[in-house]
Amino acid sequence: KELKQSPVANLSNALAGKLPGLITVQTSGQPGEDASSLFIRGVGTYGTSNPLVVIDGLPRSQTDFNQLDANEIESVTILKDASSSSLYGIQGANGVIVVTTKRGVDREKPLISFTVQQAVQQPIRLPETMSSYEQALYYRDMDMNDGQTERYTPEVLDIIKNGSDPYLYPNVNWFDEILKKNSMQSQYNINISGSALGKLRYFISGSYVNQGTLLKHQDIFEKNYGVKSKFDRYNFRSNVDLDATSMLNIRIDLAGRLETRVGPGSDFSNVFSVITTRSPSSQPVFNPDGTLGAGSALEIPFQQNPYGIVTQSGYYTRHTNVMSGTLSAKHKLDFITKGLSAQVYFSFESNNYQHTTRLQSFDSFWYKGKDATGEAIYQPHSVKSRLSTTDSRWVERYTYLDVRLNYDRTFAEKHQISAQLLGNRTLRSQNAELPYAYQGISSRIAYNFDTRYYLEANIGYNGSENFPPKKRYGFFPSFSAGWVLSDEKFISLPSWIQLIKLRGSYGTVGNDKIGGQRWLYITEFTPGGTAMGTYQFGVSPQSVAGYNESRVGNKFVTWEKSAKGNVGFDLSLFKDNAVQFTFDYFWEKRNNILTTPGDVPDYVGITNVAPRNSGKVENKGIEAELRFNKRINKDLSIFANLQMTYARNKVLENDEPIP
């Protein structure tokens, strides 16, 4: 419900401020490219810090997560400590985001909901820029302080101040000229859920999102190229559950996504870079004859006109098609022992990308004033060219196989035991590359007595083909414990205290996203084509190409290792747990971070030193959350949520040279 209340096209932005320990950083406002970077409990490595994303029990990319429609989602959970993430072993060091999508429930009639959201997007903050006159005064003071001849005479300063000659002495606020104050965003969604025949449950969702651009002059851009800057996305999801027998449940999930991005030939970030660094006096937007300006009496032309970049530099189109399917079956094995079940997942995902860029230069002229006869003087700066076309296409394929044994049983009404044994394998291929492969075995066992004492142990044994044969697998254990003090009979508490729980965990996890190239343990050789890469043979010496060692392999390269600890408590107060408070203190020591050695001197003669796992980072902090939820009556409730996360890291070792 909270996610749906945020009118954003990208799910990562909807999570801002919603979950304690999750930090979101948005760095772009480009339509369709405005995803936030996600960090769980700060940054524990100077390598890759992206968390693992799991959707409906299966690992997915963060892009899949970003482009989910909030109306499809039942819940989002963050796994932060080692105990909760160690099942993911080699991929769990940066934390895990677990998403559960909605499913059908038994009901007499289908439930149909239709949602429409209209939103206005606007920049949070833009730089305040100098005017040409303020800039001229700044330069005058600088010249005076340096004892230099002032570059602007009093007469020129008056012209700049009065704006009497805007072509030779322009004053352009490029942010106002290029950016709109706001843009529109539209979202439409329809959900249908229900059941049939007493055995079938279904959830079907479809949505459409459109984001407009913050760039001005789109009428000119559309007139020039017949396209409109935008981001369109269509989402589809179908989750079906079938009780084939009283013992067998089958799930069939299908999901798809179609995306289209269109924009000016110059990248959106480049447009921002241009208008941020462009001087207000660099050039007028237009010359007196209506051509694009390229210089002024104050600055020689050396940069392209921002208006031309937005409207006449070409355009790009990017199409993304994603289709995924999951088939799973769960069978109860009560005939072996009560509470035992087996479950198998098979998932397939296909991603197709097509990017087309059509670029061209445009006409612009430097207006240099008038000659003695009163004729305008123009000097060409850039000349319009034909559109050049660049196409790129690539395909990604994911397959995932997961087999699980689950056990959940309560003995004597007070002893509850749950356990899981899991084996999985993931293959990801891109175009003609050799596939990336992961596989492993994980297990979990949890025990609680009378919902007062909790113990849990997890073990992960996972590996990746990216590492040397003898270093591909790692062992990742963890454990956790909890104690509900408020349920103890020997502790007397006021009636308004509903819950006091202490908890702690410790364990190790890994991170295989170490950066660098694939298979760093392999030494590579390339043919030599220069005098340094040839050999002389024969009576009459002939040059024969040899091979150079282009990359030195590191046969000890491995994943990052993280030791994590966490202690905290939960507190609930008043009737219906109206006030809830949680507090956690966490710490992490990350080792084996891939680092380029800095302590190998040049005189050794090795210019391409193999990276090695020598980096170390320490990260620790606290997080707290205070929630208030009070239902006044059936139509009115009050909700408030206050969160705080503080994380501080320290680089302990970066393989730097010793001074």
Label each PLM-derived region with a short phrase.
Residues 124-125, 207, 354-365:
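Short, solvent-exposed beta-strand-terminating loops
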Residues 50, 186, 239-248, 254-258, ...:
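Extracellular/periplasmic, surface-exposed regions of secreted and cell-surface proteins
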Residues 1-236, 250, 638-640:
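Short, small/polar-rich motifs associated with maturation and membrane association
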Residues 272-274:
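Short, compositionally biased small/polar motifs
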Residues 265, 288, 392-395:
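Compositionally biased, intrinsically disordered linkers/stalks adjacent to structured regions
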Residues 145-151, 164, 284-291, 302-304, ...:
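Extracytoplasmic gating/loop element in the C-terminal half of outer-membrane beta-barrel translocons
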Residues 59, 149, 292-293, 376:
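Short, solvent-exposed loop/turn motifs
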